């Protein structure tokens, strides 16, 4: 198809504005790496919240979410618990305050405040750096696959070429160009450019999401949708049997469900909840979410920023997802059935944009999805090099390096991470395979050690190191010996192996030095098994108080998970015109918002200085 000049103009204006803002604000970033990576801790929490929400609104994730809504209906809202999406609630309720009180720049630097600088502390520090860089490379590959699948069926120009006997297909060429353009302004302006462009990009995304939802509601009647979906598609609660049966409507979808491993969704949700509790207690992984927390001016601002992220992210995103999913069910299904052969459900999103949307709206949505891609990608490109520069180069190679040298090193490390991520993207099969690898296997090795570091005073750097190594080894063995088993079902085994490594590594070595533990507890004040440290701190600092917020935090987490779910389902109910479901979700949103207002927001506090 050919693009209308209006669509081209909208996309060109958006790209030009993004690059202009990124370069225009970049002068502040070069003053120091504190400015480059954290914005000097001077940016407002609501801008950081908008930036964080924008960074989580990615094209690959949107394409995947449209696909699972198409296949699983309302029950699909449970599947993102794989991450789990509600780890943001744990961060909002208590983890953001704990993290920000440390006053550091990266997760690896934070590890030093917890475990010290002895051999165990250095080992734990290094493995966090390795994990952060590997995670970033994995996500960049994930973005590479997603944006390639997306643009190749929309942009009409064939950019494929051959070089040295190797053919670079359209998907790879488009993805490489978009990654390169985004990397350019991120490298130049650091955190300032990332946040400024992401705020603008978020506004573009909101307009696009509302427009798509309105268009879908105008084009699809409830009767058309009823005829296009099987029995159970509107059901919210996960089932314990084989799930939705598409037989006679679209038989190929049953094969998709079988290959995903999401058939018995009820059992899967129980596994995801089990995994999610421990994953969330581990805290955010070393990445852009943690970087936004470290960038806030105060611990209270960090908590409010994390709460704002969920509030502004889910309603517009799921308006778009529901709109595109409904259009796909009614208008794309006949095309997919007629095509025969192997069906790539991850191309539902591009097909709807290509064939359904009118000029102007198509350009607006493309600008919005490009904004989603660029904001998410830029967040990773800005956060990962901090670990290379601050935690490797500055710490071990040139501790006395001037600010300009460190910023320049950040440029080179950003380019290196992007290049390696693109290379990995060439070898991944699909968005879903990368999603499962990142969430269930790679992060499975992360959970045990990072949970224990918060809640148990005796845990040390050796335990952290060997816990991470054991977990990552378990994840690797899974791919060798159980490649066909869904990753989520093997999480308990990987988690148990990581726990064993953590306890053995810890109990066979000496505890963290008392001075380090006292400093950490005095500053961070987590709840958990900290009684011996608290007693010693009380003797030194009579004014210190114990953190007794565990009961209230637990209630707020449960309320927050329900609150977050209402933000997901309400837009879907609106687009599919299920008014009873919409009314219930809005009522629950109102009730949970009031509870969080009085039991969380009004009680966020920084601890006294002692």
What does each of the following model-derived ranges do?
Residues 1-610:
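Membrane-embedded helix-loop-helix hairpins and adjacent transmembrane boundary segments
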């Amino acid at each position: 198809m050919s693009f209308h000049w209006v669509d081209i103009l909208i996309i060109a204006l958006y790209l030009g504005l993004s690059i202009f803002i990124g370069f225009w604000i970049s002068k502040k970033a070069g003053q120091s790496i504190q400015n480059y990576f954290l914005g000097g801790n001077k940016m407002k929490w609501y801008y950081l919240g908008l930036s964080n929400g924008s960074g989580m609104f990615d094209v690959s994730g949107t394409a995947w979410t449209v696909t699972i809504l198409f296949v699983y209906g309302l029950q699909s809202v449970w599947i993102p618990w794989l991450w789990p999406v509600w780890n943001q609630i744990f961060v909002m309720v208590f983890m953001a305050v704990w993290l920000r009180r440390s006053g550091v720049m990266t997760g690896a630097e934070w590890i030093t405040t917890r475990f010290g600088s002895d051999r165990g502390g250095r080992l734990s520090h290094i493995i966090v750096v390795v994990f952060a860089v590997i995670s970033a490379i994995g996500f960049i590959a994930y973005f590479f696959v997603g944006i390639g699948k997306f643009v190749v069926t929309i942009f009409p120009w064939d950019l494929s070429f051959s070089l040295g006997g190797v053919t670079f297909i359209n998907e790879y060429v488009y993805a490489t160009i978009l990654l390169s353009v985004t990397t350019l302004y991120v490298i130049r302006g650091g955190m300032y450019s990332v946040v400024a462009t992401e705020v603008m990009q978020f506004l573009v995304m909101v307009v696009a999401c509302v427009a798509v939802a309105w268009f879908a509601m105008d084009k699809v009647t409830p009767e058309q949708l009823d005829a296009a979906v099987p029995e159970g598609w509107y059901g919210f609660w996960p089932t314990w049997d084989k799930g939705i049966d598409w037989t006679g409507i679209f038989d190929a979808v049953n094969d998709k469900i079988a290959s995903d491993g999401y058939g018995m969704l009820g059992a899967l949700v129980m596994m995801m909840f089990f995994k999610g509790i421990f994953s969330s207690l581990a805290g955010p992984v070393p990445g852009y979410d943690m970087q936004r927390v470290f960038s806030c001016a105060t611990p209270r601002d960090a908590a409010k920023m994390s709460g704002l992220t969920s509030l502004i992210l889910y309603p517009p995103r799921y308006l778009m997802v529901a709109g595109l999913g409904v259009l796909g069910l009614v208008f794309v299904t006949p095309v997919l059935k007629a095509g025969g052969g192997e069906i790539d459900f991850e191309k539902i999103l591009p097909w709807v944009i290509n064939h359904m949307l009118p000029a102007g709206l198509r350009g607006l949505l493309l600008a919005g999805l490009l904004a989603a891609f660029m904001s998410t990608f830029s967040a990773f490109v800005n956060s990962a090099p901090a670990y290379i520069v601050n935690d490797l180069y500055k710490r071990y190679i040139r501790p006395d390096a001037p600010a300009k040298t460190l910023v320049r090193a950040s440029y080179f490390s950003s380019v290196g991470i992007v290049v390696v991520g693109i290379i990995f993207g060439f070898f991944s099969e699909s968005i879903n395979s990368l999603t499962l690898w990142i969430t269930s296997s790679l992060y499975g090795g992360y959970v045990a050690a990072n949970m224990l570091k918060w809640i148990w005073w005796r845990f040390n750097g050796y335990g952290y190191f060997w816990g991470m190594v054991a977990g990552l080894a378990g994840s690797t063995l899974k791919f060798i010996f159980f490649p066909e088993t869904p990753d989520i079902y093997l999480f308990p085994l990987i988690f148990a192996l990581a726990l064993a490594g953590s306890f053995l590594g810890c109990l066979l070595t000496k505890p963290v030095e008392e001075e380090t533990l006292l400093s950490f507890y005095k500053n961070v004040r987590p709840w958990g098994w900290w009684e011996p440290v608290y007693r010693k701190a009380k003797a030194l600092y009579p004014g210190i108080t114990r953190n007794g917020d565990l009961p209230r935090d637990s209630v707020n987490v449960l309320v927050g998970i329900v609150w977050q779910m209402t933000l997901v389902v309400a837009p879907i109910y609106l687009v599919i015109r299920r008014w009873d479901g919409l009314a219930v979700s809005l009522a629950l949103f109102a009730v949970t918002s009031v509870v969080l207002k009085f039991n969380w927001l009004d009680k966020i506090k920084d601890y006294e200085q002692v």
